[in-house]
Amino acid sequence: SEHGGLNETFADVAAITGDKKYLELARRFSHKIILDPLIKDKDRLTGMHANTQIPKVIGYKRIAELSQDDKNWNHAEEWDHAARFFWNTVVNNRSVCIGGNSVREHFHPADNFTSMINDVQGPETCNTYNMLRLTKMLYQNSHNPCNINEPDPSYINYYERALYNHILASQEPDKGGFVYFTPMRPGHYRVYSQPETSMWCCVGSGLENHTKYGEFIYAHQKDTLYVNLFIPSQLNWKEQGVTLTQETLFPDDEKVTLRIDKAAKKNLTLMIRIPEWAGNSEGYEITINGKKHLSDIQTGASTYLPIRRKWKKGDMITFHLPMKVSLEQIPDKKDYYAFLYGPIVLATSTGTENLDGIYADDSRGGHIAHGRQTPLQEVPMLIGNPDSIRHSLHKLSGSKLAFSYDGNVYPAQKSKSLELIPFFRLHNSRYAVYFRQASEEQFKTIQEEMATAERKATELANRTVDLIFPGEQQPESDHSIQYEASETGTHKDRHFRRAKGWFSYNLKIKEEASQLMITVRQEDRNKAVILLNNEKLTVHPTVSKADKDGFIRLCYLLPRKLKVGSCEILFKPDGTEWTSAVYEVRLLK
């Protein structure tokens, strides 16, 4: 169960009531299996359900905040450290360009993003919702490593990236539906909720997401105001008697204007953020009432430009954000790249065909884009080296951001060039955010390898009636997991379940099935008795050749076809202490 937020809830009750017994409960509800490695700077997150862990860490941080002055409990500093380490490892090692994380709701290996590219169940919106909550908490008592008098800019950099590219992209602009999974698989699409059919977790958090665009634009400390984000807004800073208006068309236009609408007669400091994507100081010129403001602008690392003076009504501060195109490689350094303009992730439409279930129905998997998976060799591949690819993307004229790619693309485009727009504006379409890159020499070999792998995967998917990934929370819940003396784990970055007693699932049979395929390790092939509806499966399986990691597939030709409906499959030891560790259960036509 996703129990992660219980510790934060009790901590909040402690803050509201002033009763420390609730704070003690919050500490007791804090999951040590997650906490202890984080305190020691160890990332043990692979294989864990992502959005169960993030709320736990929010709780660690909240408890640390409320325990600073507790003389009977001296762990506040290390719990705060655990939250910061978690944030750093998820953001820097486990997140893709849009700021999201996880595949099929679970943390995949930090050094292997293959599943992120291949799977249609990409980053979950709830994860990013909670990562932004954690980001806001950590920012408020952070310090820039290069300037202890400023907050740490890394928190704003992430917040901005995730806000524009995942949160803003997670609501369909016409009907208002919310997105659960945002596939990073090139050529796939998102599914949108509907009021009558969908009440997912990402609908609940989605209702909040799109009310909070204003919460991180500004921050204040004593007589200093931080301008963090470039979003049209009005601020009423009651404590200092200041009202301020920010006007901008960012990201379509680089110009930002701050207008003082009301000011007290005293000195105040404006801290204007210089983001890391600004690159260099060329073009980052600030004027106050039309006159150039001279200042030592630090660039190359995100920081703030301080302006201290006695402000008056009508003062105008104007500056331009020097945005440029960049190319960002997927974190595991495979040959997949994303284009960004400043902090804005760009994407291309790959068609509007076969958008099956784009508006969700009320089925258990209605939030998943089940339509045809475009073979990866059919989506745009960029031919050339990364530097030449970056220089082949050109900004088009016009009021809205749009770009044209005039480099070498395979397959050749129907139009003369590939067109890209901000991902948050691309809806009701298949899309590509990440593009495979290859040199001229690599291209032919890669195409052949991708085509072979895709053909095999497509053939298997087309034959699949039902599929379970044992050890993963959602697939097991969907198939009514039951067990006795059983455990889960991971091996070679794959989830498994095994038992000293037994474990069972309810297979969902949507059409007649004639074969059962079980994935185990080679050394585990004869360790389990399999029962279908309490009847022992006695046929001998055909055994596939072991793959490079030692996994094999046992394929059983069923003596009788399974009819439409449901069927219990149960595993128990076959004269051994444990059953096989089962990695995949697949029912085939």
Which residues are covered by each model-predicted region?
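Beta-strand-rich binding/interaction modules
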Residues: 265-288, 516-518
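C-terminal beta-rich recognition modules with glycine/proline-rich loops and embedded aromatic residues
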Residues: 26, 157-165, 170, 174-259, ...
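Amphipathic alpha-helical segments of tetratricopeptide repeats
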Residues: 31-35, 88-92
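Active-site-adjacent structural elements in folded domains
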Residues: 39-47, 113-121, 304
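Aromatic (Trp/Tyr) and acidic
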Residues: 3-21, 25, 50-89, 108-274
